């Protein structure tokens, strides 16, 4: 079994535990007032592969991570599997004294590097921490210390926040380095509509500030499917799918999604 296969097995455990944590909080655990607890299963599922790879393969001791708020169930699941979180805390997720809704350095017991919330502050903090790290290194306050990578796991809706763009400007002024922003572009937002063409607009913003931009869009199975007869039509359908249709089909489920793709691809074949 190679490393990728091992990571896939870990990923399944992390995803199951994260989803169970939310399900338990909403449907199993005693709820005296009957109010919905929430927990963001979709926002957790959309980044579980990336977080599994980071925490079980890529991160070094000197690296620091700002986890997007709506991925806290995945973070707590990873910490639990690593022996840094307790069963009691995850059973009481989003409850009094339990694992926090958003990763918190002051309220959580697991290994939170940067407290994050719903206003994008964790994103900007990675850039300023990196600038401070460079200042300390230049002044030689701590000699022979390896430089860490400051990593932000960013929900696409967090990029509505103005402080994110302020720190992009400051980073450009001061030759920012050793920073990764991994944007989970899942086309979902609780606070508004995700507009068409937003990904291209965001790409142009980062390019304007001289960031090294890498776009990961298609999975391995999709890339294999593109090589099959009609694969170019499938790729075009994915690229052209508007947000409204994408959201509706995700809600309807796999069979409806598959039928719509096949119906549309057949139309593409017969169109002049």
Feature map (PLM): residue ranges:
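Short, contiguous pre-domain boundary segments
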Residues: 1-3
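Cofactor-binding active-site loop characterized by glycine-rich and histidine/acidic residues
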Residues: 6-10, 14, 18, 22-30, ...
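Residues at the starts of beta-strands that form the adenosine-phosphate
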Residues: 149, 178-180, 212
């Amino acid at each position: 079994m190679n490393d990728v296969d091992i990571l896939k097995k870990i990923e399944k455990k992390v995803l199951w535990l994260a989803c169970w944590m939310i399900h338990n909080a909403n449907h199993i655990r005693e709820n005296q007032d009957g109010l919905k607890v929430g927990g963001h299963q979709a926002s957790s599922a959309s980044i579980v592969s990336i977080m599994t790879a980071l925490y079980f393969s890529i991160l070094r001791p000197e690296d620091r991570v700002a986890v997007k708020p709506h991925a806290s169930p995945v973070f707590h699941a990873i910490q639990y599997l690593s022996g840094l979180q307790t069963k009691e805390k995850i059973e009481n997720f989003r409850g009094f004294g339990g694992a926090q809704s958003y990763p918190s350095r002051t309220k959580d017991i697991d290994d939170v590097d940067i407290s994050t919330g719903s206003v994008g502050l964790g994103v900007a903090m990675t850039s300023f921490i990196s600038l401070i790290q460079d200042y300390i290194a230049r002044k030689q306050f701590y000699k022979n210390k390896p430089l860490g990578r400051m990593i932000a796991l960013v929900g696409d809706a967090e990029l509505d926040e103005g402080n994110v763009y302020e720190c992009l400007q400051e980073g450009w002024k001061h030759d920012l380095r050793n920073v990764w922003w991994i944007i989970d572009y899942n086309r979902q937002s609780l606070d508004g509509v995700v507009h068409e063409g937003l990904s291209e607009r965001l790409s142009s913003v980062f390019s304007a500030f001289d960031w090294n931009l890498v776009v990961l869009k298609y999975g391995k199975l999709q890339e294999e499917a593109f090589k099959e007869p009609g694969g170019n039509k499938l790729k075009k359908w994915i690229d052209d799918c508007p947000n409204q249709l994408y959201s509706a089909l995700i809600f309807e489920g796999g069979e409806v999604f598959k039928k719509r793709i096949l119906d549309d691809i057949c139309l593409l074949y017969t169109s002049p």
